[in-house]
């Protein structure tokens, strides 16, 4: 009898060890999320995929601007960059920060999606924002979630549940979306909490589903869509996108590591109506479309929060420790990197009457 019990115990312990080893990337990331205590981990471990920069990136003349020091010289701010579509970027940095050193964009990663869909639309004759995703996602072809459209996903009106985040629950789609082992499968398991298009509720699944749709539109997957249509046409440095497993799917909802200057370039592309030099990346009118409030949330547009006024809207991408503000009217963007909440005065830097052109600049 004791021998039987011992054998059963040995088998069960072996199975437990095997399961732990097989899902080690999940448990490793889950521990990092848990240790962050509701904040953002300093860096998530695991495999990554390189996104290559453009041979002709959005040009910027970079200058360290002493006018920013009195504003930014607090204990919470690490980097502050102000960019103008005319081609200059003023910055202030704490001694430990570098405008060229990649940072985890955290939730800024999802800010790539609205301009990416514009870039994809620019290559197509049919309108893609209002096409039900069932046309492109076989998994939802016969599912009620197949009625969701990319526009609703960008508006955070898909109806998909936000989900409770319990990092150590390996059976939770929400935990799997954060830690793997399959980001896309996890997003496709997000349940409907509301009829599509009826309710505003941010869900991390929205970004990941959008990545699947973008990949299907491109025909070669999300990584190729992002590389070929957006990042590889504007960025000055490599970026590292987090993968769920080796040679797996990119996390569209978080965690891409890129240089602060390239996050600013994203803002300036939008601020300049989707144009780099003489090349149009986004269709005419797409940026204006991004500034239109959703039917149920007046402070949320296409993939971005909205501030400012109807005549002079400001697009915002806000995530813990990161804030990207974009003014299409002023043709400016401001990136803040720090700890805690961003300062209230940041958007003043978008206004030419308050913050003018730097006197000296150098290539950056």
Which residues make up each language-model segment?
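Active-site-proximal alpha-helical segments within enzyme catalytic domains
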Residues: 156, 206-213, 252-276, 321-339
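Active-site SXXK
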Residues: 103-129, 153, 210-214, 266, ...
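Short, charged, amphipathic alpha-helices and their helix-cap/turn boundaries
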Residues: 87-92, 134, 169-196, 220-240
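Non-transmembrane alpha-helical segments in soluble domains
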Residues: 118, 134, 151-154, 184, ...
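N-terminal leader/targeting segments and the immediately adjacent pre-domain N-terminus
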Residues: 1-98, 106, 121-128, 155, ...
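Flexible glycine/proline-enriched surface loops and loop-helix/loop-strand junctions
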Residues: 97-100, 168, 191-196, 206-208, ...
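Active-site helix/loop module of the DD-peptidase/beta-lactamase fold
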Residues: 123-161, 189, 216-254, 258
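Active-site Gly/Thr loop motif
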Residues: 237-240, 288-335, 343
